[in-house]
Amino acid sequence: MPEPFARALGWPDEPIGWSTLIAEARSERGWAAYGHPEWGPFMFGQTNPEFSTSGLSATVAEYLAAAGKREGLTLADVRAPKNRRVVRDLQRSVVHYGDTTLFFAEQMAARGPTYVSAVAMEEVTVLDYNLRLRTGGPRLVAISPEEGTFYSDNPLIVPDAPWVDADTRAAAEVVSERLISRMTPEVAAEAYFRPPDDAPPVAPVDAANGAAPTEPTALLGLPEPRVMNAIIEAWRADRKPARVEVGLDVSGSMVEEGKLEAAKQGVDGFVRLLQPQDEVGLSVFSDEPVVVAEPVPMRTGRARLLARVQGLFPEGDTALYDATDQAVARIAERAGDDRIDAVVVLSDGADNASDISFERLQERLREVSGDEGDGVRVFTIAYGSGAEAELLADIATSGGGRAYVGDSATIEQVYIEISSFF
């Protein structure tokens, strides 16, 4: 948590746990209850448990807290309506998900502490933020939840597989022994990690830099695999829903090298990954932007939207700026704190047909993305060798999202990575 936010909750004298965060997520007063209305509502951040270890650890811990347990979570616990409601209430305060906690740290460094009130992240990311990313504003402090937490290991294993011969296994043992012999507390701390045994961490893994070296005092137990699977299934149904507009370049250059056909397959896969409660719309742009489909719930509109995607064909110029501006305006008009609002734009070339300037577009994006985490985020894909990757990265930065680079061979994977935010 940003240190002032933690102190407002009584830290370090009073413990903070999942029960604290759940209570704040349910409160309508937000930080005004603690004399800080300028901090806005309580907003929580965690990564996607299907993509990220920290997100999975956080989600399991939430279910354990809801069930009042530290270990031994059962299928009945996960499926209990009371426990589902507890986790759902916390998830409704999420600003967005994602595949790495580093994105949260980068956004907090760029946009300030009101971007998110608390984030489930590894201690190493807290230290990285305080010692590398922070350029001003409060530091982050690592808080071990009073209910308990997990250690995240980085295991080294030698697969028991036909392609691992005796020489390979012997070489792996040499590497393993060398790593173990060299992994002193000092070496681990250089990368902001704790030592691999019970030895206490050393600087810079210390309280002066935001770490919690005397924690954790309680550890949680991971449930068995079938319970983990049930947690993921429940999270999919209960996570904060998204409202996304997909903007697709259909200019004449998209006919080259089968780019449009590959992009359509990427969009198809993206739409199929979203949950029934999510809403997705589609717009295309060439000489001018055109709305193909307003956002519709995937529960009822998925098949119809997929059919519209497959009916697209390329022609004309590239009105990238106008398309992005108008898509963001449409989503912003509907935006609220009940959904993750975003625009995903793919383009293979430079803008040559827009009325709005690049500079004005950036201003508009900063206005709707804002410094608080509940704005509209813009994700961009620079598609193919002719794309303006740097320009699209600037658009994503202004829009509080992330920039990606892809081609016909990788575009499906790019859309999968973007789906982690929802």
Q: What do these predicted regions represent?
A:
Residues 8-10, 53-55, 128-130, 254-257, ...:
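Extracytoplasmic/secreted cell-surface and envelope-processing proteins
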